[in-house]
Amino acid sequence: MPMSSLPAAILSHMTAINNVPPPPLHSIPNLKKSKHINYGQLNALCHIRGQHSRSMSNILSAHDTFMKQYPKVFLHQKPRLPKLFKQEEQRELNEGKEESQHQQPDDSNNIAVHVQRAHGGHILYRPKRATEKFEEFLAILKKLPIHRTPYEHKTVWKFLKTIPDLTFQLNDKHLKTLSKTVFSETWLKGSTVVANDGFYVILKGLARPQTNVYKNLIEGSDSPDSFISQSFHSFIWSEEFKNSTLAEMYLPSYDSMLSKWSTFGTLEVMPQNESETQMFSVVTEDDCEILKIPAKGYAKIKEEKIKLENMQKLKLIRMCPYYEEWPTLSIYELIALLKWKKFPPGHVIVESGNIISFVGYINSGCCNIYRSIIGFVKLRSNKVKRSQKLVYMGKLKEKESFGEISVLLQVPFTCTIITKKEVEMAIIEDKDLFVA
């Protein structure tokens, strides 16, 4: 049976296709990694556990993890700021130098500058930055101490360390504590500042002393809380004129004027009856900014220091073996007599055969104990010579005491005590013990 034309055409086409060779193989092009994708995070994201779990809780946990990790897949480039040209930068520096040179006056012929420097005062002409810092200092003092930041407390402390009348009498620790309590007061021209309740530092303006109990600080004072000024224009209350019949109110001359950084007042807390009779005051010649350190605040700091020292002494004596069962009241009687003292390494505290002059309680360090013995040394001539030597017997350690029997019974020491390294101890001198 003859085939139709259509099937024959299809058959011939299929035969022709089978005879045609397959097309050549081509390699798959490499994929370029994107610079904006973190492929390590992407790989971790694709292998999160629980994505294909049948448990609903696992699926939700995997979904939360996926959503948290997803933003890490994309890299965020940091924005780059345009570079500055060196020429412009150099030009700005040169302009700044020229301006500072023009602004700073020539003080070579200014006698006031040399006088100020000779008395240890502040230089009259300061860079612009110092002026800005001083204005910042004034603004901080206007705040209540409780509202100041740690940075502001540190700024006040740094300025207090530049005032000679304060650093002469107060250590750095006291100044740091006081810096958190000081404040500034504004006084109008013609005001009378009564300074019986604190120590004052003039920050702006002029003031004139007006009192019958002033004494120039450059002459000194025996009072433990008074200040010996390094500046001529500083005055302080003096006990020497307390009962003086020659004392009278007066206004000093212009040479005694108190200016910037001048100090006056006292850190002693005066009794009420004395503060009423002994007026300690200045009169402002301008509108003044005056820093005040309250005497009561300083007294509180001293009380806290004494309490801490007494607690340290009590703890030291309590830890010494012979005082563990002593009543507290008896120990407090000893605390009133204790003084701190340091000894360098190799210092002979007491020699054998001598009576020691104090009772010691070792707070830090240690001492070696030696016994003096007589030995015999054979010489080349077959003769024997007597020789005295120190033999090590032991040591005194921290939280141990010595010298009680020698001081109380006036018995000589049978050994020699030498410090091995620096030793700090609390001591009671024999003269204080016998008086007590």
Curated annotation (Swiss-Prot):
Source organism superkingdom: Eukaryota
Disulfide cysteine pairs (residue numbers): none
Binding site for a nucleoside 3',5'-cyclic phosphate: 322-436
Regions of compositional bias (Basic and acidic residues) in chain numbering: 89-105
Annotated region (Disordered), positions in chain: 89-108
TM stretches of this protein: none
Pfam families per UniProt: cNMP_binding
CDD domains for this protein: CAP_ED (cd00038)
UniProt cross-references to PANTHER family, sorted A to Z: CYCLIC NUCLEOTIDE-BINDING DOMAIN CONTAINING PROTEIN, CYCLIC NUCLEOTIDE-BINDING DOMAIN-CONTAINING PROTEIN 1
Name of the molecule in the record: Cyclic nucleotide-binding domain-containing protein 1
